[in-house]
Amino acid sequence: MSPTLMFVLLLCGVAAESIRETETMDPTSMLEYESSGSFPDEVFDDDEIDEDDDYAIDEDDEDYSGSGTDKFDIDDNDEDEEEEETATLGNQIPELDFDQTKTGRKIETNEIDNEIWSPTKPKILEPSNEISMASTGSEGFFQRTEVIVAIVAGTLVGLVVAISFIVFLVIRRNQNGDLVKKPIYKKTSTMEV
């Protein structure tokens, strides 16, 4: 095989991979999305200036900045305002009957109860369809199909490159005659002796 054929095959593999990548991404749909706060150009025109003011400025409003540091008139007639009395709940702590357990059963002070008593039957928990966030993060890296496909594709491309490199070296050495076994020295003929 010629090196150009190997290069063409490698180029076809790379092109096929890039075509697959562009099939998954639709560039026209990406242009439809606008970022948060962006408006089309037709909504706001900076050239138009409203000539008529719909609001009036009071002189009282100019005195106050809203920061609370300006001087303003305080009415001294605070007594006229009705003050609402707050209802206090008090600081009484309800006394609990310590002879009763959580179940409401009364226990005698001399009674020793070694029996574990449950007020209701245990509930049978049905498995939920909800996926907890902890279980989604525990998915292994190699369990994702995209990762496995990428590893297989990378391995195949690497294998093709390695095979083409070896074939290229064999062809080149064969052309130079390096692969033919040549003796290190020539035997002299016995007639000369």
Swiss-Prot record:
Biased composition (Acidic residues): 42-64, 73-86
Post-translational modification: O-glycosylated; contains both chondroitin sulfate and heparan sulfate. Ser-36, Ser-65 and Ser-67 can all be modified by either chondroitin sulfate or heparan sulfate, and the protein exists in forms that contain only chondroitin sulfate, only heparan sulfate and both chondroitin sulfate and heparan sulfate.
Transmembrane segments: 151-171
Compartment(s): Membrane
GO CC terms, sorted: cell surface; membrane
Glycosylation sites: 36, 65, 67
Cytoplasmic topological domain: 172-193
Keywords per UniProt: Developmental protein, Gastrulation, Glycoprotein, Heparan sulfate, Membrane, Proteoglycan, Signal, Transmembrane, Transmembrane helix, Wnt signaling pathway
One GO process term, biological-process aspect: neural tube closure
Family matches, as Pfam families: Syndecan
A Gene Ontology molecular function term of the record: frizzled binding
Region (Disordered): 23-90
Tissue: Expressed in the animal hemisphere from the 4-cell to the blastula stage. During gastrulation, expressed in the involuting dorsal mesoderm and ectoderm. After involution, localized mainly to the anterior neuroectoderm. At later stages, expressed in the brain, branchial arches, pronephros, tailbud, and at low levels in the somites.
Entry superkingdom: Eukaryota
Membrane topology label: Single-pass type I membrane protein
Signal peptide (UniProt feature, chain positions): 1-16
InterPro entries: Syndecan, Syndecan/Neurexin_dom
UniProt key word Glycoprotein: yes
Membrane topology (Extracellular): 17-150
The family this protein is said to belong to: Belongs to the syndecan proteoglycan family.
Entry function: Cell surface proteoglycan. Regulates non-canonical Wnt signaling, being necessary and sufficient for fibronectrin-mediated translocation of dvl2/dsh to the plasma membrane. Required for proper convergent extension movements during gastrulation, which shape the neural plate, and for subsequent neural tube closure.
Subunit architecture: Interacts with the Wnt receptor fzd7 and its signal transducer dvl2/dsh.
Protein name in the entry: Syndecan 4-A
